Curated annotation (Swiss-Prot):
Record field: catalytic activity: L-glutamyl-tRNA(Gln) + L-glutamine + ATP + H2O = L-glutaminyl-tRNA(Gln) + L-glutamate + ADP + phosphate + H(+); L-aspartyl-tRNA(Asn) + L-glutamine + ATP + H2O = L-asparaginyl-tRNA(Asn) + L-glutamate + ADP + phosphate + 2 H(+)
Entry keyword annotation includes Plastid: no
Family annotation (PROSITE patterns): GATB
Gene name, Swiss-Prot/TrEMBL: gatB
Stored Pfam families: GatB_N (PF02934), GatB_Yqey (PF02637)
High-level lineage: Bacteria, Bacillati, Bacillota, Bacilli, Lactobacillales
Main function: Allows the formation of correctly charged Asn-tRNA(Asn) or Gln-tRNA(Gln) through the transamidation of misacylated Asp-tRNA(Asn) or Glu-tRNA(Gln) in organisms which lack either or both of asparaginyl-tRNA or glutaminyl-tRNA synthetases. The reaction takes place in the presence of glutamine and ATP through an activated phospho-Asp-tRNA(Asn) or phospho-Glu-tRNA(Gln).
SMART domains for this protein: GatB_Yqey
Similarity comment text for this entry: Belongs to the GatB/GatE family. GatB subfamily.
One Gene Ontology term from the biological process aspect of the record: glutaminyl-tRNAGln biosynthesis via transamidation
Oligomer status and interactors: Heterotrimer of A, B and C subunits.
Entry protein name: Aspartyl/glutamyl-tRNA(Asn/Gln) amidotransferase subunit B
């Protein structure tokens, strides 16, 4: 029997606002536990939340980036549950009136493009963080009240590969808006998955299993692939799939049962009494839309049509906003687009992967990369010398000064090079005869002798011109 797979994804994205969604506490990653909290975050009786307008603005921008319909009228709801990292015993979220709905993202897998629908997007607050030891459990409420958007896909994803492509496209578009860092390693992007399979041709969805807080795209793919095969084995053996929540074990590459679910959770949602409904005008939506930065697709089109890059180059450069912004700044500073792109995609990416750092964490600047590229373009340094200059600009050195200080500037003055050419020719009469007899290798040998005398600093183009002129005059 052949099966078809259906995958749904819920993605929580932490917004990069200065303060929390309902309190004035700052939003900072990595601070001391409970340093960024106040009585609203602690859930003290009698305190009232105040909605951060910037969160609504960012939510609208995210909705626009995902081609979604923006709600003109919305309210907030209480989701009731108790857990130590949720001192209010409820979460303020959106149940009935999400801020955006019916969006889509285009993905490409194995050369085929496909639109994945987005059912809805909610604004909500994050919970705190529990840490457990053998003796104690600790609660850190720094994260409590951090603004989130929850993006729920439609059941359009048909494979683990499509799931990862969707997540990559989603992260990319959100990142380019600037409203979130979407860094999974810092928890600013978290992924919950559900998966089911059914016989091909069947209209009835199979029973789904859930997996929560998978912390990398690679593990999302592996977890879904394992579950897909597990479902198939169970059904082919005549068994049935239970409605379960499972977790992915990174060590074994398998999923492990956490709990079974007899029905849907009852969170006893009801409208939040301490926050008024929110009305969003067409004028405000238009204003936010006018502030939207270029999306990856628009930048790719510009790079190909206006800057002469290949489709592949444009795709690589727009994988992250950080790399794309760096490229544009370097080109603005006078760097040749193709040469800048090559350095970013090869030398820079290799360095980042080797050091396991982000571009923003290095001392490399767009102006210094552009400066080095211009030195290559005008013949001040050779491509071979540029490798040494590149090491300098990685340490924050100005390329022109570094090249001069370390003796990496090419000899390009004909007045300096001609005597060297003459000396080499005087010492290699046989090579001159070989050249006259049509042996092209003689030119290469003479070039090598000149480069040897100048310790590799002679400009090959200038040397070639002088050498050929001198040989023809013999």
């Amino acid at each position: 029997m052949n099966f078809q797979t259906t995958i749904g994804l819920e993605v929580h994205v932490e917004l990069k606002t200065n303060s929390k969604i309902y309190s004035p506490s700052p939003v900072e990653y990595g601070d001391q536990p409970n340093a960024n909290t106040n009585v609203i975050d602690w859930g003290y009786p009698g305190v009232l939340p105040s909605l951060n307008k910037g969160v609504v603005r960012d939510g609208i921008m995210a909705g626009l980036a995902l081609h979604a319909q923006i709600a003109h009228h919305m309210h907030f709801d209480r989701k009731n549950y108790f857990y130590p990292d949720n001192p209010k015993a409820y979460q303020i979220t959106q149940s009935d009136t999400p801020i955006a709905h019916d969006g889509w993202i285009e993905i490409e897998v194995n050369g085929k493009k496909k639109k994945i629908g987005i059912k809805e997007m909610h604004i909500e607050e994050d919970a705190g963080k529990n840490t457990h030891t053998s003796k104690y459990s600790y609660v850190d409420l720094n994260r409590q009240g951090t603004p989130l958007i929850e993006i729920v896909s439609k059941p359009d994803i048909a494979s683990p590969e499509e799931a990862v492509a969707y997540l990559e496209a989603l992260r990319q578009r959100i990142q380019f808006t600037g409203i979130s860092d979407v860094k999974m390693e810092e928890g600013s992007m978290r992924v919950d998955t559900n998966i089911s399979i059914r016989p091909i041709g069947s209209d009835k969805f199979g029973t789904k299993t859930e997996m929560k807080n998978i912390n990398s795209f690679n593990y999302v793919r592996k977890a879904l692939a394992f579950e897909e095969k597990r479902h198939q084995k169970v059904l082919m053996a005549g068994g049935h799939i239970g409605q379960e929540t499972r977790r992915y074990d990174e060590a074994t590459g398998e999923t492990i049962l956490m709990r079974t679910k007899e029905g849907s959770d009852d969170y006893r949602y009801f409208p939040e009494p301490d926050l008024p409904p929110v009305n969003v005008s067409d004028e405000w939506i238009s204003e936010i839309e006018s502030e939207m930065p270029e999306m990856p697709g628009e930048r790719r089109e510009h790079y190909v049509k206006d800057l002469g890059l290949t489709d592949y180059d444009a795709m690589v450069l727009t994988q992250t906003k950080e790399m794309s912004d760096f490229f544009e700044e370097a080109v603005k500073d006078g760097g040749d687009p193709k040469r800048v792109a090559n350095y970013l995609m090869n030398d820079v990416n290799s360095y980042l992967n080797d050091k396991q750092v982000d571009l923003q964490d290095t001392k490399l600047t767009p102006s210094n990369l552009a400066g080095m590229v211009k030195l290559i373009e005008d013949g001040t340094i050779s491509s071979k010398m540029a490798k040494k200059v590149f090491k300098g600009i990685l340490d924050g050195e100005e390329p022109n000064a570094y090249a001069k200080e370390h003796g990496l500037v090419q000899l390009s003055d004909p007045a300096q090079l001609q005597p060297i050419v003459d000396e080499v020719l005087d010492n290699n009469e046989q090579s001159i005869e070989d050249f006259k007899n049509g042996k092209d290798r003689a030119v290469g040998y003479l070039m090598g002798q000149i480069m040897k005398q100048t310790r590799g600093k002679a400009n090959p183009q200038v040397v070639t011109q002088l050498l050929m002129k001198s040989l023809k005059a013999k």
